[in-house]
Curated annotation (Swiss-Prot):
PANTHER family attached to this UniProt entry: FASTING-INDUCIBLE INTEGRAL MEMBRANE PROTEIN TM6P1-RELATED (PTHR21324), TRANSMEMBRANE PROTEIN 150C (PTHR21324:SF7)
Highest rank taxon of the organism: Eukaryota
Transmembrane feature ranges: 10-30, 65-85, 98-118, 131-151, 169-189, 193-213
Function: Nonselective cationic channel with high permeability to Ca(2+). Component of a mechanosensitive cation channel, confers mechanically activated (MA) currents with slow inactivation kinetics. May contribute to proprioception.
Pfam families according to UniProt: Frag1 (PF10277)
Family per record: Belongs to the DRAM/TMEM150 family.
Name of this chain's protein: Transmembrane protein 150C
Locations listed in the record: Cell membrane; Lysosome membrane
GO (cellular component) term, any one: lysosomal membrane
UniProt record, GO biological process: cellular response to mechanical stimulus; proprioception
Extracellular side stretches: 31-64, 119-130, 190-192
Primary localization class, coarse: membrane
Amino acid sequence: MDGKKCSVWMFLPLVFTLFTSAGLWIVYFIAVEDDKILPLNSAERKPGVKHAPYISIAGDDPPASCVFSQVMNMAAFLALVVAVLRFIQLKPKVLNPWLNISGLVALCLASFGMTLLGNFQLTNDEEIHNVGTSLTFGFGTLTCWIQAALTLKVNIKNEGRRVGIPRVILSASITLCVVLYFILMAQSIHMYAARVQWGLVMCFLSYFGTFAVEFRHYRYEIVCSEYQENFLSFSESLSEASEYQTDQV
């Protein structure tokens, strides 16, 4: 990969992946240090420790909850930006826009879910927290499958298969983790369920990192223009330009 030919926008999904994963692991280590949760590699419960290392439980009490809220808010914002840029990237390349629109809506709802589970801790408002978890995991999984399909269909720079196949594998892994998570939760096998949850989140974050491959080919600009009350249509502008040129002649 030639760094001189790569857009700086490729770093956005990488920053999202690295920042969010680092933030969540900081939350985990704070909670372990405070004896709020068991370490992921624990075989048995320690005296005085009541909870399995679920992410929501790790970020339930301060100071870990403060870090958790900030991480999830920033992650939601970055995910929303990625969603919009991805939609703009694919818009001129897809014939039927419904799949691209569905991907945008799904990722926006997943981002909204991140803010809910980050700002409404489990013990403070369990119902809203669980709604946020469902939105994040549910629409996040849907987003992965939609983007994998779009990747193979659009085939940007003939890299569709090279990027699409890993995304299909990650999407299948995420789906499997979601199913296993709920099965283990239903059977109260909490240590294994917590490990599956961490694996699920890391797969999500890895998936987002793959958008760097396609973002490196694109440059995005924000155009700002002064508002004019007497806005001229395109035809009127051409007419004025032609009159000006005639006067000059």
